[in-house]
Curated annotation (Swiss-Prot):
The keyword Nucleotidyltransferase belongs to this UniProt entry's keyword annotation: yes
GO biological process, one term: viral RNA genome replication
Name of the featured protein: Replicase large subunit
Span of domain (+)RNA virus helicase ATP-binding: 801-963
Length: 1616
């Protein structure tokens, strides 16, 4: 028995140890069967092919997220956002798995090609073309189908059976498979479909309003809809940028605009409504009718994608029941129905109840937010005292662990330092017995200091509050208030007074005598509360600030927002304003509104000076000087008070301007001027305004405009009389131009001293023998002017200003009521039309001459309208219903008709706005139509010194109508009009190109014999007009005179070589000049000017582009695409056309002769021939003069011939030549400079120009050199570099003044023809050892990070680790309609020109950013006198300063030096945008800024050989920056790209493929051909021989996008 037991035990132990073979075989068999069953089950899963190239980590993400599928990863297709694109296929299949096979399904916004390939003939795809991107995607799906069918046809195969039904359906009835209507408006009618209907929405519900979704589903009889969309919980915080790390995408939020994009990609962004998406997330029920709703239920969240389903619910199926007492009661049935309806209403209307009122539901659907709270963090600027606030998500357990612990501290121990120490200790890792224990809470370490301050302040206030409750304000000799302040004083030390003031200001503490009240603010907001608040804010859409009011600075913020509308609000002194409000106890918002009302002329009070300064206001209110005797006064009421102040005191003001400078005490009471004859022999002084006084206008804006118009007539009259008086006083000194406008009659001799060009002048100025001057009404007899005995001379003017102004003044004076103009109640409609839109034609078609009135500015226009209206032979237009404005006002009341039904004013915007208001009132019309052009020549105030405020120039209207189709202008002019007008301007003209220009040798060349001018002759100035008339040309007018006219052909002439202000790119005169012709315009000019540039640009426009502006009728269908492209680049895919010869032709045109250079053996020739070199002090090891032989690998041979050279071999001679041409060739241009003081001033300018004001001082609490910074630096290094540091103990530094020297084997190609005459030097690299870089690398990395965080990124771009898309975003908000100067600073020998001054500037910048003094001194000495050693070439030398091209600060150092250089020379406070990168810079300034002599300053101060270029387009880091009216696009330099295709260093085909991919990455923007025309202009600006290059851009796209085709650009060198 004992043996049996022993044997059994032994056998059992053998089995356990695995020594029993029988048991082992059974276990293996069982394991095998289990594995087979598992693999068979896996094989039965749906199979999905994943062709996109993704990483192993992304492969694991996809596999774990979708275990329902058997995914095969092929990694055969490179694509943008590969993971997201591949996951989209998995998401589609997952949604289709939820639907019974064969049931009718609507795919909202789906991919119909995917369903065809899967053989789903029961799916209808609703694919609306909401934007151009949708059209492109749909065309791509069609292409994929055609590609699939062509492959089958090429292989002799047919469509598989499982696909045949779907493909037959698509071929026969395509609208049954796919439509392009929105889901809400889709009208698809299924054919004999039974069973339930389903729908899926894959990333498409964003664009369907949530309020319309339920009804749209019901209209299609959908039973269940399955949807998927992207979302992130962090969108509910105050962050404007949220990352989706798993798919490398991001959300950015701006108000209600939510933008989704993929990081590091140039694909188009997707814009949605944030409030709409929030409704889909938060709402549970989506009403479809008064009976049915769709209930939403979340299914699962996978890889940043949320899945949910919407189920159709019939609310009539709800249980009907109610408690009752009497069965027979009639109220029973009513109560039952009411209760049931109430129950149904709750289900349909309280749609947010389930999610918003149940916090557990929130925690379930937002698992990351469970037990998380939102804690506010605060910061304050020491300079400006401005407070900033942000929010972070922190574990609730962590918050209360800290609060509960620090609440136990004694009063002396409760300090900020102790709180921070405790918070850091519970967050840090702990090492126990050599094992690292991770902290329970993963809180970002960068937040610990701010969190500690929040915890500390909250606890401190809570402790004080508890003490107050206990003590009840009685603690012996000291009051509780005194005890509290003592406690706070101990905590804060010397900072106590400011802390006390801060607590009082924030109203966290209030003091009233000895009583003290403390309010402890809420510490946090839960995620559930934030979700509820965000959702309700999006539904109700109020202007709600959901932040806790923990500071009263919110009021000040709103006040400053109110003030931000003012011009130059950035210069507003916020501190002074704040102190004023505090000291006077004034509400900041009230004060801000008053300031804005006065300074923006919205207070009903207009000050005609520029700014309401103290001096100007005092001048407006001061007493006036005494008037001279004999003054003629135009007044309409009695005046009692002797001054303007008196009038203001009693609440009324005299009509401005009628009295000039004269005081009211000199007015004649009740003196009225009944007729113009009363002006006869009035003293000239009474009409001449010697000085324009500070006038105050009151009343509504229309009244103020009308008063200003009366003043303008007075000013015009006084100016005309003054000019005639001046001529009489000095007749001999009149120039030729003035003589043509005036005449002077000598009364004694009856001769004209200056003969006037016209005759029978109605008015003149008379000089008497007593040297008195009077205005006189002239009469004529047989001998001429009738004169008086005491007259000496008479001056007349060919202009009728005196007579017309007097007549209009007389009329307007009669219209005044108690000195105030009357404003009509008629409706005023502004018809804003482009040139040639048919404004006159429209007036004639709408007018009824029996009851309407037409007013025009000039006689010619009035005659033209009468002629066109009476062309049928029936006289309908007469001088009674078609008048000039002057005639109507001068003869008002003399016509038989005084009232009109409608008033039409042609070219009304050329009139003074007050004049228009008077015309409307005088016509007594019911409605007035003012036809004009807001971009053409407006009313011009021609009286120098007369104030015409800017807000007076805007006509007050009730309605605005636009006309944007021109019947006159050809297509090229229409292209120009689109730059000037909002909205799309179209043309009905069949003429495409009509403008041309000709530069003439001088003004003398223009004469009728040698240069006959075709068509209508126009000029810009009166002097040019008179010159042409004097030379024999006829019918010549100025541009201003012919506004509104139309001519077949126009010759525009400029004879004035000096600058003319009205000839500018944005000038209305240029617009009028370009838009007068219907067939042709030719511009003859003696100088280059902006109009020449405009015409040259229009001449280069392609015909297909001009076809876009062609319209056959007046409908403007193109207006519909405005919303598609607004604020983003238009994308037009570039056709893939062209050949290698296109690239070669383009290169040869741009750089003629470069491709013929045979430079393959230049390096060999230099080594073999004698050479003479001038060398500075250096040591040469001649044993290294002969390089060691190496095996030569024959590279691939390029088919494109460029100036590229073969890689050179390392050697003493090659390295020495490079060192001589670079390190030994530094310029010496600088003058005598006080280095330290000048460097300090330059750095002051640098910080003031580029850094945000609140970040100009370093954060001394942050350590620059730490373990974290070293680890960050090590992560960027290669393994070889880290290996070099294995024996470095970081105790002592190697010699910091010792550098190694080497060079790049591949010479740099220059985009010029210098290769034809010189041997290019190689680029040298001077670098430290890795041990020194390990010290300074992390240090400068942290300093660089601080610098870039402090830069004003809205205006300045320091190009470090930026993508082309980020460059486009930075320059994207440039307004192309605003005239700008684009500046580039070109510096040669930039690195080697830097001397002691540059070193001092850079050191001062780093020092102010927090660079430690000892290491700073070490770094400075390491860049002063330095030793260079080239062990390969055997060269050793010494250089002073210079930029080391391999130093840790090479790139950022060069960047800050170029920025500091420009800040010291240019007015950076005026800059619009600025970008800096190494030695490259690009600046955008407002047009017309004055710049100093940059070359002189750069030479003397900076030792730079510099040139400042002004360009139309920027060139930055090898890329052209093309700004346009919708944003900005960055094109890689196509010539540089072609130059790289001639590379002779490509080793093999694998190296070639890597080369192609790198070129594809930088040249991706060339795929967009929408802005090729602007790119042509930009290239031509640099290379004047460059032809239009769209053909070569398309060729580059073709070859770069096809790796097989790209191989044809090279041939194998080993086979040659």
């Amino acid at each position: 028995m004992a043996y049996t037991q022993t044997a059994t035990t032994s056998a059992l132990l053998d089995t356990v140890r695995g020594n029993n073979s029988l048991v082992n075989d059974l276990a293996k068999r069982r394991l095998y069967d289990t594995a087979v069953e598992e693999f068979n089950a896996r094989d039965r899963r749906p199979k999905v092919n994943f062709s996109k190239v993704i990483s192993e980590e992304q492969t694991l993400i996809a596999t774990r997220a979708y275990p329902e599928f058997q995914i095969t990863f092929y990694n055969t297709q490179n694509a943008v956002h590969s993971l997201a694109g591949g996951l989209r296929s998995l998401e589609l299949e997952y949604l289709m798995m939820q639907i019974p096979y064969g049931s009718l399904t609507y795919d909202i916004g789906g991919n119909f090609a995917s369903h065809l390939f899967k053989g789903r003939a029961y799916v209808h795809c609703c694919m609306p073309n909401l934007d151009v991107r949708d059209i492109m995607r749909h065309e791509g799906q069609k292409d994929s189908i055609e590609l699939y069918l062509s492959r089958l046809e090429r292989g002799g195969k047919t469509v598989p059976n499982f696909q045949k039904e779907a493909f037959d359906r698509y071929a026969e009835i395509p609208e049954d498979a796919v439509c392009h209507n929105t889901f809400q408006t889709m009208r698809h009618q299924p054919m004999q479909q039974s069973g339930r209907v389903y729908a899926i929405a894959l990333h498409s519900i964003y664009d369907i309003p949530a309020d319309e979704f339920g009804a749209a589903l019901l209209r299609k009889n959908v039973h269940t809809c399955y949807a998927a969309f992207h979302f992130s919980e962090n969108l509910l915080l105050e962050d404007s940028y949220v990352n989706l790390d798993e798919i490398n995408a991001c959300f950015s939020r701006d108000g209600d605009k939510l933008t989704f994009s993929f990081a590091s990609e140039s694909t188009l962004n997707y814009c949605h409504s944030y409030s709409n998406i929030l409704k889909y997330v938060c709402k549970t029920y989506f009403p479809a009718s008064n009976r049915e709703v769709y209930m939403k239920e979340f299914l699962v969240t996978r890889v940043n994608t949320w899945f949910c389903k919407f189920s159709r619910i019939d609310t009539f199926l709800l249980y009907k029941g109610v408690a009752h007492k009497s069965v027979d009661s009639e109220q029973f049935y009513t109560a039952m129905e009411d209760a049931w309806h109430y129950k149904k209403t709750l289900a349909m209307c309280n749609s947010e109840r389930i999610l918003l009122e149940d916090s557990s539901s929130v925690n379930y659907w937002f698992p990351k937010m469970r037990d998380m709270v939102i804690v506010p963090l605060f910061d304050i600027s020491l300079e400006t005292s401005k407070r900033t606030r942000k929010e972070v998500l922190v574990s609730k357990d962590f918050v209360f662990t800290v609060l509960n612990h620090i609440r136990t501290y004694q009063a002396k121990a409760l300090t900020y330092a102790n709180v921070l120490s405790f918070v850091e200790s519970i967050r840090s890792r702990v090492i126990i017995n050599g094992v690292t224990a991770r902290s329970e809470w993963d809180v970002d370490k960068s937040l610990l200091q701010s969190l500690s301050m929040t915890f500390y302040l909250h606890t401190k206030l809570a402790v004080l509050k508890d003490d107050l409750l206990i003590s009840k304000f009685s603690l012996g000799s000291k009051t509780v208030c005194q005890h509290v302040w003592d406690e706070i004083s101990l905590a804060f030390g010397n900072a106590f007074p400011s802390v006390k003031e801060r607590l009082l200001n924030r109203k966290l503490i209030r003091v009233a005598g000895d009583a003290l009240e403390i309010r402890v603010p809420d510490l946090y907001v839960t995620f559930h509360d934030r979700l509820v608040t965000e959702y309700k804010a999006s539904v109700d859409m109020p202007a709600l600030d959901i932040r806790k009011k923990m500071e009263e600075t919110e009021v000040m913020y709103n006040a400053l927002s109110e003030l931000s509308v003012l011009r130059e609000s950035d210069k507003f002194d916020v501190d002074v304003f704040s102190q004023m409000c505090q000291s006077l106890e004034v509400d900041p918002m009230t004060a801000a509104k008053v300031i804005v009302a006065v300074m923006s002329n919205e207070s009903g009070l207009t000050l005609t000076f520029e700014r309401p300064t103290e001096a100007n206001v005092a001048l407006a209110l001061q007493d006036q000087e005494k008037a001279s005797e004999g003054a003629l006064v135009v007044t309409s009421r009695e005046v009692e008070e002797p001054s303007m102040k008196g009038s203001m005191a009693r609440g009324e003001l005299q009509l401005a301007g009628l009295a000039g400078d004269h005081p009211e005490s000199s007015y004649s009471k009740n003196e009225e001027i009944e007729s113009l004859e009363q002006f006869h022999m009035a003293t000239a002084d009474s009409l001449i305004r010697k000085q324009m006084s500070s006038i105050v206008y009151t009343g509504p804006i229309k009244v103020q405009q009308m008063k200003n118009f009366i003043d303008s007539l007075v000013a015009s009259l006084s100016a005309a009389v003054s000019n005639l008086v001046k001529i009489l006083k000095d007749t001999a000194a009149i120039d030729l131009e003035t003589r043509q406008k005036f005449g002077v009659l000598d009364v004694a001799s009856r001769k004209w001293l200056i003969k006037p060009t016209a005759k029978s002048h109605a008015w003149g100025v008379v000089e008497t023998h007593a040297r008195k001057y009077h205005v006189a009404l002239l009469e004529y007899d047989e001998q001429g002017v009738v004169t008086c005995d005491d007259w000496r001379r008479v001056a007349v003017s060919s202009e009728s200003v005196v007579y017309s102004d007097m007549a209009k003044l007389r009329t307007l004076r009669r219209l005044l009521r108690n000195g105030e103009p009357h404003v009509s109640s008629a409706k005023v409609v502004l018809v804003d039309g482009v040139p040639g839109c048919g404004k006159t034609k429209e007036i004639l078609s709408r007018v009824n001459f029996d009851e309407d009135l037409i007013l025009v500015p000039g006689k010619q226009a009035a005659e033209m309208i009468r002629r066109r209206a009476n062309s049928s032979g029936i006289i309908v237009a007469t001088k009674d219903n078609v008048k000039t404005v002057d005639s109507f006002m001068m003869n008002f009341g003399k016509s038989t008709r005084c009232q009109f039904k409608r008033l039409f004013i042609d070219e009304g915007l050329m009139l003074h706005t007050g004049c228009v208001n008077f015309l409307v009132a005088m016509s007594l019309c019911e409605i007035a139509y003012v036809y004009g052009d807001t971009q053409q020549i407006p009313y011009i105030n021609r009286v120098s010194g007369f104030p015409y405020p800017a807000h007076f120039a805007k006509l007050e209207v009730d309605e605005v109508e636009t006309r944007r189709t021109t019947l006159r202008c050809p297509a090229d002019v229409t292209h120009y009009l689109n730059r000037r007008y909002e909205g799309f301007v179209m043309s009905t003209s069949s003429v495409k190109k009509s403008v041309s220009q000709e530069m003439v040798g001088g003004a003398a060349v223009i004469n009728p014999i040698s240069k006959p001018l075709h068509g209508k002759i126009l000029t810009f100035t009166q002097s040019d007009k008179e010159a042409l008339l004097s030379r024999g040309y006829s019918d010549v007018h100025t541009v201003h005179e012919v506004q509104g006219e139309t001519y077949s052909d126009v010759s525009l002439v400029r004879l004035t070589p000096t600058p003319v202000s009205i000839i500018a790119g944005d000038s209305p005169h240029v617009l009028v000049a370009l838009s007068r012709h219907t067939c042709s315009l030719k511009y003859y000019t003696v100088v280059m000017d902006p109009l020449v540039s405009i015409i040259r640009d229009l001449e280069k426009l392609s015909s297909y582009l001009l076809d876009m502006y062609k319209v056959d009728a007046g409908t403007q269908x193109q207006l519909q695409i405005d919303s598609v492209f607004k604020g983003s680049n238009l994308f037009v895919a570039a056709p893939k056309t062209g050949d290698i010869s296109d690239m070669q032709f383009y290169y040869d045109k741009c750089l003629p002769g470069n491709s013929t250079m045979m430079n393959n053996f230049d390096a060999v020739t230099m080594r073999l021939t004698d050479i003479s070199l001038n060398v500075k002090d250096c040591i040469l090891d001649m044993s290294k003069s002969v390089a060691a032989p190496k095996d030569q690998i024959k590279p691939l041979i390029p088919m494109v011939r460029t100036a590229a050279e073969m890689p050179r071999q390392t050697g003493l001679l090659e390295n020495l030549v490079a060192m001589i041409k670079r390190n030994f060739n530094a310029p010496e241009l600088s003058g005598i400079i006080d280095i330290e003081n000048t460097a300090s001033l330059v750095v002051d300018k640098f910080f003031d120009s580029y850094l945000l004001k609140e970040k100009r001082k370093p954060n001394k609490n942050v350590s620059l050199f730490s373990r974290e910074s070293l680890n960050r630096w090590l992560e960027k290094q290669e393994q070889v570099t880290i290996g070099q540091l294995a024996d470095f103990d970081f105790v002592d530094l190697p010699a910091v003044d010792q550098y190694r020297h080497m060079y790049k084997a591949q010479p740099k190609q220059k985009l010029d023809t210098s290769i034809q005459t010189e041997y290019p030097a190689l680029q040298t690299i001077v670098y430290h050892s890795k041990k020194i870089n390990a010290i300074f690398g992390p240090l400068f990395s942290e300093l660089t990070r601080q610098l870039l965080d402090s830069v004003d990124s809205s205006r300045f771009l320091f190009f470090t680790r930026k993508t082309p898309a980020q460059i486009e975003d930075f320059f994207g908000d440039l307004d192309s309609h605003v005239p700008m100067d684009v500046l580039e600073l070109d510096i040669s020998k930039y690195d080697k020109s830097q001397n002691e001054f540059h070193c001092a500037v850079e050191y001062e910048i780093w020092r102010r950013l927090g660079f430690e003094d000892f290491l700073g001194e070490v770094w400075k000495q390491g860049h002063r006198k330095t030793t260079l050693k080239d062990y390969t070439a055997g060269i050793k030398t010494c250089i002073w300063y210079q930029r080391k091209s391999g130093d840790v600060t090479t790139f950022i150092g060069n960047t800050v030096i170029i920025a500091a250089c420009l800040a010291s020379m240019l007015p950076m406070e005026k800059i619009i945008k600025g970008a800096f990168c190494g030695d490259d810079s690009l600046l955008y300034f407002p047009k017309g800024c004055e710049f100093p002599d940059v070359q002189h300053s750069a030479n003397l101060m900076w030792n730079f050989e510099a040139k400042l270029f002004k360009k139309q387009y920027g060139y930055f880091c090898g890329r052209y920056v093309i700004h346009h009216d919708r944003g900005c696009i960055v094109y890689y330099d196509p010539l540089k790209l072609i130059s790289k295709l001639g590379a002779k260093h490509i080793k093999d085909w694998e190296h070639l493929e890597e080369f192609r991919r790198s070129l594809c990455d930088v040249a991706v923007s060339l795929n967009n051909c929408a802005y090729y025309t602007q790119l042509d202009d930009a290239v031509w600006e640099v290379h004047k021989t460059a032809p239009p290059g769209s053909f070569v851009y398309k060729s580059l796209v073709k070859y770069l996008s096809d790796k097989v085709l790209f191989r044809s650009l090279f041939i194998d060198g080993s086979s040659c």
